[in-house]
Amino acid sequence: KILKKNRIILVEDACESIGAKYKNKFLGTFGDFSTFSFYFSHQISSVEGGMICCKNKEDENIIKSLRSHGWSKDLSNQKKIENKFKKINKRFLFINSGFNFRPTDIQAAIGLSQFNSLNDFIKTRKINRDKIITKLVLDKRWKNQVSFINNNNSIKPSWFGLSMLLNKKYKNKKNIIFNKLDKLGVENRPIMSGNFLKQPALRKYYLKQKSKDFPNANFIHEHGLFVGLKNRILSQIETKKFANIFFKAFDV
């Protein structure tokens, strides 16, 4: 209702949520457009690049043109455009400003080949997440060092990684913990960019909103921790190794 009333175009940033559902509807199908990332740590990986989804042919043609220098090539209305601009060689007919965002053939092939396995990847990541959490909380060294993000019945998650929130005791030791995890062989990162209003890139826009106005985003910024999940089932040896590293990192 808000979108229609204000004539707003909604672009869903669903970059890490491919396959996830809210009220039995896929994330990425609520807005006019949605974006997904196929970076190497994601559920599907083409090393770089990703996918844009839209709802009609007109928007699809615009996106295809924008990704390819504004070219008319391979559009569903290509013939119509060529007939409109007959004085321009149809092989090099540019109808828009644009970018060079086309994947290489090998990247596209790698990405497309994984779609048939997506549901298996999602199931495997959930199994790995459950195995890691169970291993941690049943360990005698477990002292609620972190809390885990849980979902309700309305949500069917597609876990990108194992997201955690540090206990307030460790808030000021976050960077030490991150560095110890790195040195012990567990790659990690904050939960995305945290409160994006803290990022220097936004300073040039002189926004009225201040980072302090978003306490929940600030909490995630200060307490959030991500570690990766694999697309194959972890062994008992691997989960035990992770647990040992986890508790060593939090021994600060």
List each language-model region with its residue ranges:
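Active-site core of PLP-dependent enzymes with the aminotransferase class I/II
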Residues: 1-9, 19-22
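Short, well-ordered coil/turn segments that N-cap beta-strands
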Residues: 8, 32, 223-225
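Hydrophobic residues in well-ordered beta-strands that form the structural core
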Residues: 10-12, 190
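Conserved active-site segment immediately N-terminal to the catalytic lysine
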Residues: 12-45, 61, 90-95
